[in-house]
């Protein structure tokens, strides 16, 4: 078919058709029937226009080739075959100069004699069927429709055929010749049938008996039969319907649906202001672990015992000093709180038997840090409803923050591999059914790709901290309990390892409602010098507490060890979700599964093994200012997991709003990329609802920045 097209049609038409297909992401070498159809349609449009001019008296005349036509105006403006943006510019210009209503879809021609747009159709089916489809789609009085078939039939709006008999005969003869040429090469049948490419499997089935009766009973009101309903659905064009419904609602509502073009969307406006700060409940890439390998001490597995053993592995403690104060806090209290923790751990070690839990003495620095007695007294509303000046607290508007580079670094780090495994392969019984075998295989491949990922470490750390904090909040409501921040993993050699990140001290926790807040002070070890990115640590008071000797390629190096201290808070509902962070593994596995399913349905066999074992193939991971980033399937697994984990770590109303609203714009852009000619109304309102979520949250700002990169590259 491709050879036939290149021989049969003018090279200029072939070139235009190739350009059009490439603009829509289609390949002329693969979709050869479509290639032929586009060339045929373009040739008919050009033949429709050929030799037709308007003379100085405004009359339509035909000028044969060779006759002088230099001073005459072309009767038809050809819109078909132009670049999409140029075509809309031409249409807009015609509408502005002639006053003709703007069409919703790009027409093929404009007739300066009759002052109307023309939609040309070339069909391999019945002309009246194709005419109805076109009319249903366009739903416009302004656009005139003219349909030709390969059998010599034609149909036009109000039987007004625009051109003289001879011009139309020339087009019909050319179409008949194309058909004969195709038939002689054995191409016609395939070409004729390919126009019904929209038919679905069920249309080929004859629905009879009970199923037919059920189908007829299930129809919406006002439809007499299944065929009747199908015809309506096939011809349904939602944009015009929505416009009509809106105009019925109120005279004030005037939602003109505008075509959404490549030039329509603008980037999201990110807020200006000081850089955003770290707001996760625990340190991520900056965390430092004190660890013990192959723990076998007495009481192994009891958090306090494990913590004491980990603390004993470090010998570089020194007198703590404040290196980065908290702007608004009483920093000396944070310093004293750490000293108290050290002293009380020393007391534990001095005891003959280590207690299972440790409640801190309620010293004034700890009371201050945990907000003890800071909450205003609650008074029953009935006791104060007569107070004349009763009002809600004045609360400040949130301060706008700008995107800072640290959050992208955090995300990149979360996608990386560590040298430890954070997931135990849970034992599930023998597979019984074939589908179970496929599911197990997928789970095992996926687990192998993500078990060493840093995002998986964050999951296990989050699950541990939230579980311990919720337990303590319920079991010791009035106590300032000391909770070690612990995780467990396996080394490359398979040895068990217990890690200590730092400590949490829980405040009073009489949590009646899901949203009641428990305050806690977190104290976390780190080797990151806070003075490198002070804006990231706005909420922290940071102490220097020791020197750690590290082995490097050039020998041993001493690095200062810091303690990141801050007051924080959480609620029962947040801790409940934190305990269920393992769900992130399931979510990302399901996303990978849908990719495997898509590949398998194309190849008509299960592609799990090939999908994971073909190391040479790369997959799209995400957008960056450089373009579409690609990587191995393992990198895709880890990136999807990291996104899911960050959605959990940085969960907020801003993220909820941004995700819901930006998804609408994303779907519109996807529709444009899929050549579905989307229309929109109140696009400004959609942008407003997205941008009102861009305030100060680092993860939301990063997602907005990624969204802008996507817009740039998706609409090239």
Swiss-Prot record:
Q: What is its main location?
A: host cell
This protein's cofactor list reads: Mn(2+)
**Entry keywords, A to Z:** Cap snatching, Endonuclease, Eukaryotic host gene expression shutoff by virus, Eukaryotic host transcription shutoff by virus, Host cytoplasm, Host gene expression shutoff by virus, Host nucleus, Host-virus interaction, Hydrolase, Inhibition of host RNA polymerase II by virus, Manganese, Metal-binding, Nuclease, Phosphoprotein
User: Where do the annotations place Mn(2+) 1 binding?
Assistant: 41, 108, 119-120
| E.C. number | 3.1.-.-
Where does it reside? Host cytoplasm; Host nucleus
Sample GO molecular function, one term: RNA binding
Instruction: Output the InterPro entries linked to this UniProt entry.
Output: INFV_PA, PA/PA-X, PA/PA-X_sf
Provide the binding site for Mn(2+) 2. 80, 108
Can you supply a Gene Ontology BP term from the record?
symbiont-mediated suppression of host gene expression
| UniProt motif Nuclear localization signal 2 (NLS2): location | 184-247
Instruction: Supply one GO CC term from the record.
Output: host cell nucleus
Q: How is the protein altered post-translationally, as described in the entry? A: Phosphorylated on serines and threonines by host kinases, including human casein kinase II.
Domain of life according to the entry: Viruses
For this chain's record, the cofactor binding note is:
Binds 2 manganese ions per subunit.
- The short motif Nuclear localization signal 1 (NLS1) is annotated over 124-139
Self-association and partners: Influenza RNA polymerase is composed of three subunits: PB1, PB2 and PA. Interacts (via C-terminus) with PB1 (via N-terminus).
Relate the protein's function as given in its record. Answer: Plays an essential role in viral RNA transcription and replication by forming the heterotrimeric polymerase complex together with PB1 and PB2 subunits. The complex transcribes viral mRNAs by using a unique mechanism called cap-snatching. It consists in the hijacking and cleavage of host capped pre-mRNAs. These short capped RNAs are then used as primers for viral mRNAs. The PB2 subunit is responsible for the binding of the 5' cap of cellular pre-mRNAs which are subsequently cleaved after 10-13 nucleotides by the PA subunit that carries the endonuclease activity.
Family the entry assigns: Belongs to the influenza viruses PA family.
Would you tell me the protein name for this molecule? Polymerase acidic protein
The organism encoding this protein is Influenza A virus (strain A/Swine/Wisconsin/1/1961 H1N1)
Gene of origin?
A: PA
């Amino acid at each position: 078919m491709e050879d036939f097209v290149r021989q049969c049609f003018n090279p200029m038409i072939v070139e235009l058709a190739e350009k059009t297909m490439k603009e829509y992401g289609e390949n002329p070498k693969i979709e050869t029937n479509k290639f032929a159809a586009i060339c045929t349609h373009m040739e008919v449009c050009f033949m429709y226009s050929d030799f037709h001019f308007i003379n100085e008296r405004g009359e339509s005349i035909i000028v044969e080739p060779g006759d002088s036509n230099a001073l005459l105006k072309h009767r038809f403006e050809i819109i078909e075959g132009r670049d999409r943006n140029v075509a809309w510019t031409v249409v807009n210009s015609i509408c502005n100069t002639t006053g003709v209503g703007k069409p919703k879809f790009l027409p093929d021609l404009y007739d300066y004699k009759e002052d109307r747009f023309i939609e040309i159709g070339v069909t391999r089916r019945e002309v009246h069927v194709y005419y109805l489809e076109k009319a249903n789609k366009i739903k416009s009085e302004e656009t005139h429709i003219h349909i030709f078939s390969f059998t010599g039939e034609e149909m036009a709006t109000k039987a007004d055929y625009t051109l003289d008999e001879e011009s139309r005969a020339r087009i019909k003869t050319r179409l008949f010749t194309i058909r004969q040429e195709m038939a002689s090469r054995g191409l016609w049948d395939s070409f004729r049938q390919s126009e019904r490419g929209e038919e679905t499997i069920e249309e080929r089935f004859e629905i009879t008996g009970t199923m037919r009766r059920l189908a007829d009973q299930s129809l919406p009101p006002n439809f007499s039969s299944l065929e009747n309903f199908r015809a309506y659905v096939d011809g349904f064009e939602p944009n015009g319907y929505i416009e009509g419904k809106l105009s019925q609602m109120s005279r004030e509502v005037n939602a003109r649906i505008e075509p959404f073009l490549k030039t329509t969307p603008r980037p999201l406006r990110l807020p200006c202001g000081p850089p955003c700060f770290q707001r996760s409940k625990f340190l991520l890439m900056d965390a430092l672990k004190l660890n013990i390998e192959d723990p076998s001490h007495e009481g192994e597995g009891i958090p306090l015992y494990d913590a004491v053993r980990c603390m004993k592995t470090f010998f570089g403690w020194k007198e703590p000093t404040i290196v980065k104060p908290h702007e608004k806090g009483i920093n000396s209290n944070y310093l004293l709180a750490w000293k108290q923790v050290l002293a009380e751990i020393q007391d534990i070690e001095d005891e003959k038997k280590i207690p299972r839990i440790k409640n801190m003495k309620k010293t004034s620095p700890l009371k201050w840090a945990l907000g003890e007695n800071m909450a205003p007294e609650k008074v029953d509303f009935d006791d104060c409803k007569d107070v004349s000046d009763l009002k809600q607290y004045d609360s400040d508007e949130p301060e706008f923050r700008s995107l800072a580079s640290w959050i992208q670094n955090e995300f990149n780090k979360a996608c990386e591999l560590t040298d430890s495994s954070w997931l135990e392969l849970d034992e599930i019984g023998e597979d019984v059914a074939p589908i179970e075998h496929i599911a197990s295989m997928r789970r095992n491949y996926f687990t192998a790709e993500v078990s060493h990922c840093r995002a998986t470490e964050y999951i296990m750390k989050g699950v541990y901290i939230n579980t311990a904090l919720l337990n303590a909040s319920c079991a010791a409501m009035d106590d300032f309990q000391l909770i070690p921040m612990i995780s467990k993993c396996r080394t490359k050699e398979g040895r068990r390892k217990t890690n200590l990140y730092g400590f949490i001290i829980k405040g009073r926790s009489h949590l009646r409602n899901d949203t009641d807040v428990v305050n806690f002070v977190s104290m976390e070890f780190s080797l990151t010098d806070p003075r490198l990115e002070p804006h990231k640590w706005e909420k922290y008071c940071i102490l220097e507490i020791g020197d750690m000797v590290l082995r490097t390629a050039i020998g041993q190096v001493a690095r200062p060890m810091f303690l990141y201290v801050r007051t924080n808070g959480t609620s029962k509902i947040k801790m409940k979700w934190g305990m269920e962070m393992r769900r992130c593994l399931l979510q990302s596995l399901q996303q990978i599964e849908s990719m495997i399913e898509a590949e398998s349905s194309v190849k008509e066999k299960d592609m799990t093994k090939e999908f994971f074992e073909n190391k040479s193939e790369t997959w799209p991971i995400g957008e960056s200012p450089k373009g579409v980033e690609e990587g191995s399937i393992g990198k895709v697994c880890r990136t999807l997991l990291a996104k899911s984990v960050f959605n959990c770590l940085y969960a907020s109303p801003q993220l909820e709003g941004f995700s819901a609203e930006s998804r609408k714009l994303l779907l519109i852009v996807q529709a444009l990329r899929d050549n579905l000619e989307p229309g929109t109304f109140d696009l400004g309102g959609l942008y407003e609802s997205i941008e009102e979520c861009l305030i100060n949250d680092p993860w939301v700002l990063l997602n907005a920045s990624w969204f802008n990169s996507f817009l740039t590259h998706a609409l090239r």
